């Protein structure tokens, strides 16, 4: 579906899903490499239609290979607006409450709307210091129930997109390069990448319609 939107948006070509699938299958690229398929679990979706009323926040764990063959661990903090799918991303070298607090301050400055609620899992980075920092800023902080990541499903799904469309194509050359490329990816995701939830519109196109 997304390829069809790209063709229409950027190349003015109308191609059906079936045609795209046949071409990909012919060339052996109709499936991305990765984990075998899993049975889909149907869960209730929660949608907030006002920008900023509900922000999902989570951390994506990253492992790269450094110049000397060593493992380099980094942490992508992610916030996604439920109503528009507008996202903010930032890389840290540690997985801490201090960095979660810094990221909360970052998205308050970055997002072009008032944030009313942040929803997170029960990870140690989102505990008391983070919780009360956010609450003191006038933002409600809610925890999802343990063992129910689907309640933060939008940020989880966006992390899969990061893996498939960004990190899978990335060659790690150091933190400065990584941070610069992540800024480019964030901008592409928000302003140029068609989104299924908005029938091919980008998150910022959806945002303009809701403001």
Where are these regions (language model features)?
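Basic, flexible linker segments flanking DNA-binding modules
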Residues: 1-63, 132, 148-149, 202-210
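Buried hydrophobic side chains on well-structured beta-strands
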Residues: 3, 85, 118-119
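An active-site-proximal beta-strand-loop segment
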Residues: 57-87
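Active-site beta-loop-alpha junctions of metal-dependent nucleic acid enzymes
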Residues: 72, 89-113, 117
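Short small-residue beta-strand/loop micro-motif enriched in glycine and branched aliphatics
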Residues: 86-90, 142-144, 168
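Acidic/histidine-rich, metal-coordinating catalytic segments
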Residues: 95, 113-127, 147, 199, ...
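RNase H-like polynucleotidyl transferase catalytic core
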Residues: 117-122, 136-154, 170-173
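C-terminal domain-tail junction helix/linker
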Residues: 128, 137, 161-211
